[in-house]
């Protein structure tokens, strides 16, 4: 159960800021927490400023096992505490106090505006390891729907066909270790920080927030089980998926120089590597603060190839763990449509500037399952209820 250890934290607005007379780091604040009088608080956060709305723990508030009380700090009494997201326990961000949008009323309980109270189910994946569809929350929801006879809610998706008249991205699969590669280019991206509830959900699932675009790809990987990668479009113009004849070194997003051999599949900008397929992107093409145009990748790669590459590189990632399980290639385009929908929801000024560029190296044959009720009845020795079982299979 998440969030149950937190109470009494409200929206507080900083009305005045004075430097502490004896400390370069501390500030003397007056906080409007929706009460009749302003509250005196001592705070050392670097981002304090007049007008900022933040998470304010009033006297009597509880954060874990700590109860907030009036406290003397460097000669002044602090009647509460301005909190970072890390101190509240909703992310690992302790760079400064939490920043809340101006439209929220002072004194509002944080739990009334954010999904802090939540229940997290931990599923042991030992029983799911050979079910790639269960490596995302939606797959688990599908199982629950089938078992309980409930309707599975569909994804909200963007209509990618609306962009069919736009230019295609210059992309080519040159190695069949990539089964399917789908990509889309989006520009006019203005938002850098993810919505609070998205950051909370990521944190509760064990992932840290990075920036909006990276967070959104991670969010959808957890939701759908389909890894994606966002490139800075300034660094990626001609996408080629291939291997190289000679070994070389490649610096990944974590800043590590890795030795790439001729068996490792790479995503390239022309002949320049920009990502290790199915494992991790490159540092030179990462999304940065001034990125306004991205090229979004959603693909499926040969599971054995990804597994062997992770062993050679001694580097296993959340993405590679999923690619190692033979992901469904039919999910790549759905994931892009979901990404664009959510991106538009929180950054409405974005503009899709390419059509969906989608290539198969090869396709699996379509499999149709026939349900023979009489055979199942004879085989199991019981009479099955057709409607119940068929609905479960359809789900």
Residue locations for each model-derived region?
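Phosphate-backbone binding interfaces of nucleic-acid-interacting proteins
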Residues: 1-161, 295, 312-313, 318, ...
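Glycine/proline-enriched, intrinsically flexible loops and inter-domain linkers
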Residues: 19, 27, 152-249
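Short, hydrophobic beta-strand segments
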Residues: 118-127, 179-187, 318-326, 362-380
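Conserved small/polar residues in nucleotide/adenosyl-binding loops
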Residues: 388-395
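Conserved phosphate/anionic-ligand binding catalytic regions in large, soluble enzymes, centered on
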Residues: 52, 129-146, 208-228, 271-289
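Conserved mixed alpha/beta core segments that line enzyme active sites in large multi-domain catalysts
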Residues: 13-34, 38-40, 217-284
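Mobile "lid/hinge" segments at catalytic clefts and subdomain interfaces of large enzymes
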Residues: 80, 270-364
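Terminal amphipathic helices with adjacent charged low-complexity linkers/tails
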Residues: 152-169, 350-375
């Amino acid at each position: 159960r998440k969030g149950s250890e937190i109470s009494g934290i409200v929206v507080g607005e900083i009305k005045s800021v004075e430097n502490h007379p004896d400390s370069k780091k501390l500030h003397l604040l007056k906080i409007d927490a929706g009460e009749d009088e302003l509250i005196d608080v001592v705070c050392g956060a670097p981002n304090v400023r007049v007008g900022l709305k933040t998470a304010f723990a009033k006297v009597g508030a509880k954060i874990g096992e700590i109860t907030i009380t009036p406290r003397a700090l460097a000669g002044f009494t602090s009647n509460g505490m301005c909190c970072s997201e890390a101190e509240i326990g909703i992310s690992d961000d302790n760079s400064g106090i939490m920043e809340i949008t101006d439209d929220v009323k002072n004194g509002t309980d944080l739990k009334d505006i954010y999904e802090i109270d939540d229940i997290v189910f931990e599923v042991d994946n030992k029983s799911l390891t050979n079910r790639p569809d269960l490596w995302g929350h939606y797959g688990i929801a599908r199982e629950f729907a089938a078992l309980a006879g409930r309707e599975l809610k569909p994804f909200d998706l963007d209509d990618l066909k609306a962009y069919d008249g736009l230019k295609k991205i210059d992309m080519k699969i040159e190695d069949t270790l990539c089964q399917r590669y789908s990509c889309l280019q989006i520009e006019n991206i203005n938002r850098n920080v993810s919505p609070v509830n998205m950051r909370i959900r990521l944190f509760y699932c064990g992932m840290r927030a990075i920036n909006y675009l990276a967070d959104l790809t991670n969010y959808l990987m957890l939701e759908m089980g389909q890894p994606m990668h966002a490139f800075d479009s300034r660094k990626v113009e001609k996408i080629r998926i291939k291997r190289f004849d000679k070994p070389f070194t490649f610096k990944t997003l974590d800043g590590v120089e890795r030795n790439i051999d001729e068996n490792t599949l790479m995503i390239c900008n022309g002949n320049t590597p920009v990502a290790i397929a199915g494992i991790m992107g490159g540092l030179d093409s990462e999304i940065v603060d001034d990125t306004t145009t991205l090229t979004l990748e959603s693909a499926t790669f040969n599971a054995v190839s990804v597994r062997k590459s992770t062993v050679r590189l001694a580097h296993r990632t959340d993405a590679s763990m999923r690619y190692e399980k033979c992901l469904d290639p039919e999910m790549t385009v759905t994931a892009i449509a979901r990404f664009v929908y959510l991106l538009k929801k929180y950054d409405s000024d974005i503009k899709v500037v390419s059509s969906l560029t989608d290539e198969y190296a090869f396709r699996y044959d379509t499999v149709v399952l026939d349900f023979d009720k009489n055979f199942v009845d004879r085989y199991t020795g019981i009479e099955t209820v057709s409607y119940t079982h068929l609905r479960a299979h359809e789900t």
